[in-house]
Amino acid sequence: MERWQNIHNVVVVGLGITGLSVVKHLRKTQPQLTVKVIDTRDNPPGAERLPEQVELHRGGWNTQWLAEADLVVTNPGIALATPEIQTVLAKGTPVVGDIELFAWAVNKPVVAITGSNGKSTVTDLTGVMAKAAGLTVGVGGNIGVPALELLEQDADLYVLELSSFQLETTSSLKLKAAAFLNLSEDHMDRYEGMADYRAAKLRIFDHAELAVVNRDDQETYPEVEMPVVTFGSDEQAYGLEVDGSRTWLLDHGQRVIASDELKLVGKHNLANALVVLALLKAAGVDYHNALNALKNYTGLTHRCQVVADNRGVKWVNDSKATNIASTMAALSGLESTGKLYLLVGGVGKGADFTPLKPIFATLNLQLCCFGLDGDDFMPLHESAIRFNTMEDVIQQISSQLKSGDMVMLSPACASFDQFDNFMARGDAFAVLAQKYA
């Protein structure tokens, strides 16, 4: 392949799962190359799995290797602004990521998703529904399996979640459709400001046949003229129609499915489902054959996931909500006929939680505050009660629960005061839900 004609020495920067997938892919598809790895960590994860023919420089940079490289493949966790990478770029040596290598190698249709919130759910559900429609599907990227590993099995369609970091080093990814879900402040330690962050996200449209964008968030629209389809909370294009007590998902005026037929929780997940319909249609998949999969989809673990539904009480694990924006998204358009018992708290990371107050005011709410920074939530609602642990909360409220109520963990905080990570916190909630439901 002509892309590789003048490339002899490749340096992979950053090991871990992604770095290993790059090394494996290069050795399999371009065995003529000399591949070396640099990782600034003393004990990089995956070092023991590196083939012995591949040299590893650990604990710092190797500027000589970088100077001799014809191509540098960098990990998304390493900023392009890093001085050593800037030196490589100044010399004119191409710096790419694993997604760019995927773009060079893939020969089947690809759809991709980016956004500040919701992209993992959209990616996963797109894959689930495409499989239900009879396709062989490779799902990965920023979620689950690295993109290059997906190429090891043949597929009819690839569905990729792409972060802004991955998009920075991607320039030739051809897509049947690309979705930009929303934009909210994140990763400001990496970007100069919101404009830079948005510009990285917009790169997803560079070689896309169709842009799927959010009518309710103008920041998601491409800056260039290209075919666009929109999703949103009104009745246009992919939208929502309220008819009495029911809400319908619409595809250009046609009712597809009613929200009360879905196991997914929250209005933001209706928007996510609309994006999936748009992506499937753009990829030539008849989603009507997969509506049962949509009905039965409960969401990704720890993301608005129904973990118990007993005696009319739903227990929802949204432990992935480690910031205010995620909790606000989860609470918007919640359909609960009874009282919402909302569990919040943990490590607040210095955040100001007052933006939650107006949303709390609209809910039939019992606010249950726990963990290190639980006190920060106490002034936000008159119902707030302080607990020490999540188990204390559930022991106390379990006897009060009635049919129509919902118990939801959406803490708006990190977990490491009482748990190893948000997954462990969510698992603990799920166990308690099964015990007390």
Swiss-Prot record:
EC number: 6.3.2.9
Gene Ontology terms, MF aspect: ATP binding; UDP-N-acetylmuramoylalanine-D-glutamate ligase activity
Residues where ATP binds: G115, S116, N117, G118, K119, S120, T121
Keywords per UniProt: ATP-binding, Cell cycle, Cell division, Cell shape, Cell wall biogenesis/degradation, Cytoplasm, Ligase, Nucleotide-binding, Peptidoglycan synthesis
Residues passing through the membrane, by range: none
Pathway assignment: Cell wall biogenesis; peptidoglycan biosynthesis
Coiled coil regions, renumbered to chain: none
SUPFAM superfamilies referenced in this protein's UniProt entry, alphabetically: MurCD N-terminal domain, MurD-like peptide ligases, catalytic domain, MurD-like peptide ligases, peptide-binding domain
Gene Ontology biological process terms from the UniProt entry: cell division; cell wall organization; peptidoglycan biosynthetic process; regulation of cell shape
Compartmental location: Cytoplasm
Gene3D superfamilies in alphabetical order: Mur ligase, C-terminal domain, Mur-like, catalytic domain, NAD(P)-binding Rossmann-like Domain
GO cellular component: cytoplasm
Protein function: Cell wall formation. Catalyzes the addition of glutamate to the nucleotide precursor UDP-N-acetylmuramoyl-L-alanine (UMA).
PANTHER family: UDP-N-ACETYLMURAMOYLALANINE--D-GLUTAMATE LIGASE
Family per similarity comment: Belongs to the MurCDEF family.
Name under which the protein is recorded: UDP-N-acetylmuramoylalanine--D-glutamate ligase
Organism whose genome encodes this protein: Vibrio parahaemolyticus serotype O3:K6 (strain RIMD 2210633)
Gene transcribed to yield this protein: murD
